[in-house]
């Protein structure tokens, strides 16, 4: 017996050692996964990905004109490139939102980020597949400063490039153009799972009162991305396009020269790298984060019939029937259910109204903001670079702050659904008032020779106006570009050539007949408008306030939406939201705003015998029409917010009851009971607590999970 003791002791020691080693391995495993078991780490990773997504989208906008000149594209061509992102996104957003809710959401987001990285790299590829950029050096017509001056006696007819060759190159089929379109489609496809799956994943793993703050941070990063994109665009376009292939010290042009083309491809490479590395982090997160027993983890979700919600909710938000296997529904059946579920969602007035209101708010941003830089140039006589810098440093940061504050207010004030919709209505009213003030903040149209006034500073009466006059008939002036100059007589001319200036120092301008010959000079740019500087400063301040206040409605709208659908429909409902945002909020508004702006044009350029871009607008009509469209969209959004509030208020009075007395089945299902207090004793009548609004999206026959619809 004594001999066995050492053996037993030794066996027990070995067993203890094995248990100790196993415990240490378990601790190491926990340590390895602990970094990716924190929802805050996921938030940081998602923010990095959304920041990169917003950056690459804005960067494309900042280099569109560079692409147009580099590959001889028309404005319609670059418009197709810009819209290709939405086409790729629309193609898959519903499918990704539906099937993504049932799969591994972080991995799907990571795959989407890698696809976006591939699209960004393909966007830069055309520069490396085509020939180096060649510019015409020493054109006499433009002079040393790149100014369009009077070419008397046809002195420059043989100096510049062949116009026929330019037109042939412009209309030739360009495979690089198709490659750019394909790259943008890839970017749109890759962006599909990032927003809806990321939002639903975060909402499933945070406390209800913290959800608005987390979502607000997400959308803040998405809006902050465009500011980074514009800044990156301004930096890259100052670098010569072929700087990696040639010695730039031998260049005789600068970024201010009209022949300069910047390194448009550099930003796409940088964005591709950022997208790729931020996507890799997503593959480390599990499908379901470990549960946390924190107070307030209850979700203010829609209450469905039966006691399905007494079971723990999977992290992907999909509840399955306990007797139903995972593979019960075929792929075809799952596809067949999508139209039914979509119709069911849209048949709910609360869901439909809040989605349409969000579409109207986004439509203002997509339409008004898309042409805001152009508006600043036309109204306040700013340069393109100055307008973009102001937008990047003022309006966009204010919008980011507004989205963050909106989520913070919802969290700090613990707003219910009714409180959130009231906040959205108030924010809408204040921002609409700011837009109304824009009607009175602008500059009048400056007098332009041959367009708004006659040559010689006479009022525009009698015969039709014509920019060609006897003073410039022999100058061979062209209308393919707009390089305005301000004459000493206070009149703006389309170019130094139209002013009759035959010297590159802009003197001796024959069309300035109201001033002495020695003073017949012009300076580059439009003539200033009286009081325009003061109006611009006021406009800029109001624009900052408008961006700040208007953006505060975004987070409450998303919060209302995800609180008015059942958990298993959350990801799909967000997919429907983003689909409609693109269909109604991103695609039509730029077309509507653009058509309205074009209707205010006073003078069109011509290129290769065809009508080109508008170079001069009626500022007053432009301002009224441009701002009025935004006001109309904001007003429509307020009507939809009001309708949503009425629906919520009526259902609140109907379903939310005191806990005194018994409750019917319908009253019970729509009461203040949540997942955590089902089956518990009713709250005493004397105990005060915040009543939660629960809107029952599903009818009683829709009480099962998604597969029951089959």
From Swiss-Prot:
<feature type="transmembrane region" description="Helical; Name=4">
    <location>
        <begin position="175"/>
        <end position="203"/>
    </location>
</feature>
<comment type="function">
    <text>Putative organic anion antiporter with apparent broad substrate specificity. Recognizes various substrates including thyroid hormone L-thyroxine, prostanoids such as prostaglandin E1 and E2, bile acids such as taurocholate, glycolate and glycochenodeoxycholate and peptide hormones such as L-arginine vasopressin, likely operating in a tissue-specific manner. The transport mechanism, its electrogenicity and potential tissue-specific counterions remain to be elucidated.</text>
</comment>
<feature type="glycosylation site" description="N-linked (GlcNAc...) asparagine">
    <location>
        <position position="153"/>
    </location>
</feature>
<feature type="glycosylation site" description="N-linked (GlcNAc...) asparagine">
    <location>
        <position position="505"/>
    </location>
</feature>
<feature type="topological domain" description="Extracellular">
    <location>
        <begin position="439"/>
        <end position="539"/>
    </location>
</feature>
<feature type="region of interest" description="Disordered">
    <location>
        <begin position="1"/>
        <end position="25"/>
    </location>
</feature>
<feature type="transmembrane region" description="Helical; Name=6">
    <location>
        <begin position="262"/>
        <end position="286"/>
    </location>
</feature>
<dbReference type="GO" id="GO:0008514">
    <property type="term" value="F:organic anion transmembrane transporter activity"/>
</dbReference>
<keyword id="KW-1015">Disulfide bond</keyword>
<dbReference type="GO" id="GO:0043410">
    <property type="term" value="P:positive regulation of MAPK cascade"/>
</dbReference>
<feature type="topological domain" description="Cytoplasmic">
    <location>
        <begin position="101"/>
        <end position="106"/>
    </location>
</feature>
<feature type="transmembrane region" description="Helical; Name=12">
    <location>
        <begin position="631"/>
        <end position="648"/>
    </location>
</feature>
<feature type="topological domain" description="Cytoplasmic">
    <location>
        <begin position="204"/>
        <end position="222"/>
    </location>
</feature>
<feature type="transmembrane region" description="Helical; Name=3">
    <location>
        <begin position="107"/>
        <end position="131"/>
    </location>
</feature>
<keyword id="KW-0325">Glycoprotein</keyword>
<dbReference type="GO" id="GO:0043252">
    <property type="term" value="P:sodium-independent organic anion transport"/>
</dbReference>
<keyword id="KW-0406">Ion transport</keyword>
<feature type="transmembrane region" description="Helical; Name=10">
    <location>
        <begin position="540"/>
        <end position="562"/>
    </location>
</feature>
<keyword id="KW-1133">Transmembrane helix</keyword>
<feature type="disulfide bond">
    <location>
        <begin position="471"/>
        <end position="501"/>
    </location>
</feature>
<feature type="glycosylation site" description="N-linked (GlcNAc...) asparagine">
    <location>
        <position position="381"/>
    </location>
</feature>
<feature type="transmembrane region" description="Helical; Name=1">
    <location>
        <begin position="41"/>
        <end position="60"/>
    </location>
</feature>
<keyword id="KW-0812">Transmembrane</keyword>
<dbReference type="Pfam" id="PF07648">
    <property type="entry name" value="Kazal_2"/>
</dbReference>
<feature type="disulfide bond">
    <location>
        <begin position="486"/>
        <end position="511"/>
    </location>
</feature>
<dbReference type="GO" id="GO:0006811">
    <property type="term" value="P:monoatomic ion transport"/>
</dbReference>
<feature type="topological domain" description="Cytoplasmic">
    <location>
        <begin position="649"/>
        <end position="705"/>
    </location>
</feature>
<keyword id="KW-0813">Transport</keyword>
<feature type="topological domain" description="Extracellular">
    <location>
        <begin position="367"/>
        <end position="386"/>
    </location>
</feature>
<feature type="transmembrane region" description="Helical; Name=7">
    <location>
        <begin position="345"/>
        <end position="366"/>
    </location>
</feature>
<feature type="modified residue" description="N-acetylmethionine">
    <location>
        <position position="1"/>
    </location>
</feature>
<feature type="transmembrane region" description="Helical; Name=9">
    <location>
        <begin position="415"/>
        <end position="438"/>
    </location>
</feature>
<feature type="topological domain" description="Cytoplasmic">
    <location>
        <begin position="287"/>
        <end position="344"/>
    </location>
</feature>
<dbReference type="GO" id="GO:0016324">
    <property type="term" value="C:apical plasma membrane"/>
</dbReference>
<comment type="similarity">
    <text>Belongs to the organo anion transporter (TC 2.A.60) family.</text>
</comment>
<keyword id="KW-1003">Cell membrane</keyword>
<dbReference type="InterPro" id="IPR036058">
    <property type="entry name" value="Kazal_dom_sf"/>
</dbReference>
<dbReference type="InterPro" id="IPR002350">
    <property type="entry name" value="Kazal_dom"/>
</dbReference>
<dbReference type="GO" id="GO:0043123">
    <property type="term" value="P:positive regulation of canonical NF-kappaB signal transduction"/>
</dbReference>
<feature type="topological domain" description="Extracellular">
    <location>
        <begin position="132"/>
        <end position="174"/>
    </location>
</feature>
<feature type="domain" description="Kazal-like">
    <location>
        <begin position="465"/>
        <end position="513"/>
    </location>
</feature>
<feature type="transmembrane region" description="Helical; Name=5">
    <location>
        <begin position="223"/>
        <end position="243"/>
    </location>
</feature>
